[in-house]
Amino acid sequence: MKTKKFLESKQKSINWQITLKVLIIGVITIALLVPKFMILDLIGQRQHTAEESSKEVMQSWSLDQTVRGPVLAIPYTERNIDSNGKELNEEKEFYLLPKKLEIEGQVFPEIRKRSIYETVVYESAIKMGGHFDISGFDALKIPPENILWEKAKILVAIHDLRGINDRVEFGWNDSVYAFSPGMENKLVGNNGISLQMPQLLPQDFPAHFQFTLNLKGSESLNFAPLGETTEVTLQSAWNDPGFTGSFLPAEHTINNEGFTASWKVLDFNRNFPQQWKNDEYRVTDADFGVKLVTVADHYQKSSRAAKYGILIILFVFLSFFLNEIITKQKVHPFQYILVGFAVLVFYLLLLSISEQLGFNLAYLISSVSVLIMILLYSRTFLKKWVHAIVQTLILTFSFGFIFVLMQLETYALMVGSIGLFLVLALTMFVTRKINWYGE
């Protein structure tokens, strides 16, 4: 009778110890969230530092570029009668966009480094041509005698004028003119170049134009579809482009040697006409172009990986706890803490090494280093190599599983959900014969 009571008392003690251990593991897991969030904050700080370094390079070189033009701005006189019957003459402007606009660009990328951080900059040769036509001009209902043709201007907006490498000459029919810096009219942009056309006459139309921009910039190059038909072709040796803006290319080719992309945009595809008066429309909302994407996205990947940190810790703690239950080999809470910190140190190694060697190689080096450390350490308290190896293999699977999720963007949720389902099913299978109450 005493023996039975002793066994029951001992079993209750064991049950209480298991419950207490589960609670302790839960508290440790929650406590480890604090350093995990500190690591996420550190990743954000390093990313901010990299972005600031990139901005410094761009400020010294030239910013991202957007080219909008050419636009023909022609003043006219509007006659009004005030309340006293006095005639007032007010000078206003109307705007004509090209009937046809063709753009051919060669982009020559270059990597600039500041400290350990890289920024992509470029030089470009952009040939622009086409023709203007005033066949639809009558819709504006401006009396011909009120038009001040001698004050007409050509406007070309350029986001960062520091990027202009050479003087820009404008071919107009059989004549050549030189652009001047600055642009009073902000219709097409805040910065740009302009050209006075003092000899412009209505009989000059249709008028053909062509000019070349040798332009340097950073990260992206964009254009506005100002032609009734706008055709743009860009070529570059950069093999990782991102197409941005209101329109994607109609055709593009990307390979190891670079990319070629072609756009065709009609006036029907945008929200402004070919001619208008005053400031009725703006042309700044239809830009499109290319971004030279840098593959150094290790901060985003490191951040995503760190967000899975608690999942890996749960996998590891679960495997150690089940090992305790199955083998009766106890693991001290302090040993759980050290193993948890080892997993978190993995993310610090990943962040620091990826800044030098890239994400994939950094992931391999960091995971192997932590796996070896945990293998050798767990051998000291699990007593047998086979148990330590099993725990290390489980952690290896966890690291590998997270790495696969990092490579998958579209299917990451589905693969992650299936993976968790299989882990839960395996845990149920392994623990199906454990008598938790000793009955």
Region spans (language model):
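Alpha-helical transmembrane signal-anchor/signal-peptide segments
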Residues: M38-L63
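N-terminal Lys/Arg-rich, disordered targeting/topogenic segments
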Residues: M1-I14
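Charged, low-complexity helical/coil segments in non-catalytic cytosolic or luminal regions
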Residues: N84, Y95, L148-K151, I158-P181, ...
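Short extracytoplasmic
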Residues: K55-S83
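Hydrophobic alpha-helical transmembrane signal-anchor segments
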Residues: S13-D41
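Cytosolic-side membrane-insertion boundary helix
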Residues: R282-I313, V331-P333
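Soluble non-transmembrane domains of integral membrane proteins
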Residues: H48, E52, Q59, G85-A286
